[in-house]
Amino acid sequence: MSDEITNGAAKPTEAISGPTFTIEKIYIKDVSFEAPNSPAVFNEAGQPELQLNLNQRVQRLNENAFELVLHVTLTCTAAGKTAYVVEVQQAGVFGLFGLDQHAIGVLLGTQCPNILFPYVRSLVSDLIQIGGFPPFYLQPINFDALYAETLRQRAQNEKEGSQISSQPAGNA
């Protein structure tokens, strides 16, 4: 029997055999809430307009670790004035061991953002309510479809690029 205490964290890399996907850390990288026209904007009548911008960035940290940052900006305008702007950068470090490049791309493009999105949704909703505005809940996002669309666009761009480079240039 051992007196060693573990905290439930993943075993060291040497102990991992076969393809493995791990969540190493989830954290807030950056967060901002601005309500530049409050308190006057609280009295504005009419339907507010919302604009959502979502993107993600991946950085390879080492051979088997990747940081994915999910960046969401939500802007609400009422009567032509900015009611609020919420920006959240939710990040995670993920371990991807024994996987080929295609599998790594799929996990980073689909599963990792799916893991981070509930944190983003909660943080955005909390910030808006704490800022004095009615609740707003980000709706689910189909990251599988977004990833498939990204691959389709990338293939289309490569196809167009190869067509352009195969055409004669200038007055040949």
UniProtKB/Swiss-Prot annotation:
GO biological process, alphabetically ordered: protein folding; protein tetramerization; protein transport
InterPro entries, sorted: SecB, SecB-like_sf
SUPFAM superfamilies attached to this UniProt entry: SecB-like
One term under GO cellular component: cytoplasm
Pfam families named among the record's database cross-references: SecB (PF02556)
Domain of life: Bacteria
GO MF, any single term: unfolded protein binding
Main location per the UniProt record: cytoplasm
Keywords tagged on the record: Chaperone, Cytoplasm, Protein transport, Translocation, Transport
Compartments where located: Cytoplasm
NCBIfam families in the record: PRK05751.1-2, PRK05751.1-4, secB
Family statement drawn from the similarity comment of this UniProt entry: Belongs to the SecB family.
Subunit structure: Homotetramer, a dimer of dimers. One homotetramer interacts with 1 SecA dimer.
PANTHER family: PROTEIN-EXPORT PROTEIN SECB, PTHR36918
Function comment: One of the proteins required for the normal export of preproteins out of the cell cytoplasm. It is a molecular chaperone that binds to a subset of precursor proteins, maintaining them in a translocation-competent state. It also specifically binds to its receptor SecA.
Protein name: Protein-export protein SecB
Source organism: Xylella fastidiosa (strain Temecula1 / ATCC 700964)
